[in-house]
Amino acid sequence: MATKETWKVVTPIQSRDRIVWPVADPTLLQPSNANPLVMGELLQLDSAGKLIRATDDTKPSWCLIDSAGRADVQAISSVTVIGVDAMMFDTLVFDNAAAPALGAVLMQATVTNAAASLTNKSGFKTHAAGGEQVMGHVIQIAANNGGYLRVLMSRA
């Protein structure tokens, strides 16, 4: 489990931006899980309408904003996600082996950030040339932001 904050909001989040949604696998909310969900990870809806770790880069994804291990989140097996309006945030959940450049278009992918001890997380990487969903743009590179990638996400 990461001991450093994995995600920090730069712009305010209004109530209309947040949605509490059930997760398909409540064990991912437990810190003892081998690969638990962490704040800032991207989640998508499965065929049952529940949230799962994002794996399909052609579908919309939303950022998880609950801290890992919260008892209330585990009790209701639901998490809070955002991504309705434009927002800016700093994240460690990105591919730091191929760190996105300033202005880069971002997509969802399974990523590792060795510097932050995050492995196989659903996060951000530089957009490929295919039909993947655009998740945001880099507005400050990690090297100039304490290791965090600053992202501007603007989607409906």
What is the predicted role of each segment?
Residues M1-A156:
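Surface-exposed, low-hydrophobicity beta-strand/loop segments enriched in small/polar/acidic residues
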